């Protein structure tokens, strides 16, 4: 059974693979905007041949119009992505049938070797293929988990801006492939029927990708070990949200990996006032990028000071979107037990940090309290109630 831990491992392997493969140079045509549009346009003649009925023709025409409008909208972004080194020699055929779990390790196999044009692509096109495949199979939660862990590993949140284009493209490729199979003379009637239904399902999925979502901005608030990351981890799957973690971005700003040990005395090292300011500024910038791409964003940080929260409330107001403050807590004895017992991870907090936070945190203002949802992570029913409140 495919589980979240499997997709997290595949995200790590694929992210690391993308980091080390060759990058398309400026003198290569691969990844140029016109090369991005070309394979997308090639889907439509075949789709019209596979689905000649009037109703399908109208849907295909609308999807082609969206593709062309999207290309015009993101043309400069496609060029920027290549300039910034995100067009690389990728796997090229990254879907579930080319992934395996062997001896408790992830294995990615059968890369696309015969056509370099389909292999030298934006890494986000490759990510979009697997995200689409998971969603098409009814695994939206696992798709969100994979996407989040890939982004957390690479920091490529800017790539979300072009992800909708690639999701539509990948869904239409699958629609075309199944449509062609349904027309093959040597296929039996059962296979033709199954492929025909799959073709229509992928077409419907592509249409859903073209519909703008209603993103919202969610920030966590709580001291170390209160369970912020555990809560946000659950919300990733249920909301299809993108999470940004202060523990990870703080270290990224310093050129460190998430697993690096950056422990220091309270308000020292990466956690001094300058480091804290830079981290929250980074979180605000990334949240804006994620929202602009049409995704709900969860900002996983302590947010113990009003001055840290206010810019995020202002961002939500500016964008005209829903804003939520998750007040995440647990009894102090539980907090201390968690600090002592938890394994090393992205967080560097110890008991001294917890003591400082408990003494210095600022309560929500009256203006902020209307956005508050409370979660006691020591109570089993609390998370379920939160899910209901956010639906």
Model-identified regions with their sequence ranges:
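Hydrophobic positions on the alpha1 helix immediately C-terminal to the Walker A/P-loop
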Residues: 231
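ATP-dependent phospho-/nucleotidyl transfer catalytic cores
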Residues: 1-96, 100-216
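Conserved phosphate-donor/acceptor-positioning beta-strand/loop module used by diverse small-molecule
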Residues: 319-339
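Conserved lysine of the Walker
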Residues: 228
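Conserved substrate/cofactor phosphate-moiety recognition/catalytic segment
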Residues: 234-295, 337
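The conserved Walker
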Residues: 223-224
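Small-molecule kinase domains that catalyze NTP-dependent phosphoryl transfer to phosphate-bearing small molecules
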Residues: 341-387
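Hydrophobic anchor at the beta1->P-loop junction of P-loop NTPases
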Residues: 218-220
């Amino acid at each position: 059974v495919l589980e979240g831990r499997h997709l997290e491992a595949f995200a790590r392997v694929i992210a690391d693979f993308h980091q080390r493969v060759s990058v398309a140079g400026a003198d290569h045509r691969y990844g140029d905007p016109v090369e991005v549009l070309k394979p997308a346009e090639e889907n439509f003649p075949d789709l019209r041949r596979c689905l000649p009925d009037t109703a399908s023709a109208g849907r295909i025409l609308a999807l082609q119009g969206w593709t062309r409008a999207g290309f015009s909208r993101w043309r400069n972004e496609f060029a920027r992505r290549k300039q910034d080194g995100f067009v690389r020699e990728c796997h090229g055929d990254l879907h579930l049938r080319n992934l395996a779990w062997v001896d408790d390790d992830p294995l990615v196999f059968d890369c696309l070797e015969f056509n370099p044009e389909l292999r030298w692509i934006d890494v986000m096109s490759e990510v979009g293929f697997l995200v689409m495949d998971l969603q098409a199979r009814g695994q939206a939660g696992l798709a969100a988990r994979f996407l989040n862990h890939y982004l957390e590993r690479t920091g490529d949140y800017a790539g979300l801006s072009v992800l909708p284009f690639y999701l539509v493209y990948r869904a239409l490729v699958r629609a075309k492939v199944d449509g062609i199979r349904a027309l093959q003379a040597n296929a039996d009637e059962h296979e033709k029927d199954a492929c025909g239904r799959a073709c229509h399902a992928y077409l419907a999925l592509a249409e859903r990708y073209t519909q703008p979502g209603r993103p919202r901005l969610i920030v966590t608030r709580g001291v170390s070990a209160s369970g912020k990351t555990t809560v946000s981890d659950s919300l990733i799957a249920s909301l299809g949200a993108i999470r940004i973690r202060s523990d990870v971005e703080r270290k990224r700003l310093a050129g460190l990996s998430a697993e690096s040990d950056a422990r220091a005395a309270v308000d020292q090292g990466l956690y001094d006032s300058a480091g804290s300011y830079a981290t929250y500024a980074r979180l605000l910038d990334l949240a804006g990028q994620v929202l602009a791409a049409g995704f709900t964003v969860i900002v996983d940080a302590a947010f113990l000071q009003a001055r840290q929260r206010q810019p995020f409330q202002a961002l939500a107001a500016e964008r005209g979107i829903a804003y939520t403050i998750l007040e995440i807590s647990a009894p102090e004895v539980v907090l201390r037990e968690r600090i002592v017992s938890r394994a090393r991870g992205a967080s560097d907090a110890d008991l001294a940090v917890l003591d400082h936070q408990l003494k210095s945190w600022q309560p929500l203002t009256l203006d902020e309290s209307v956005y508050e949802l409370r979660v006691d992570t020591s109570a089993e029913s609390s998370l379920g109630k939160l899910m209901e409140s956010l639906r």
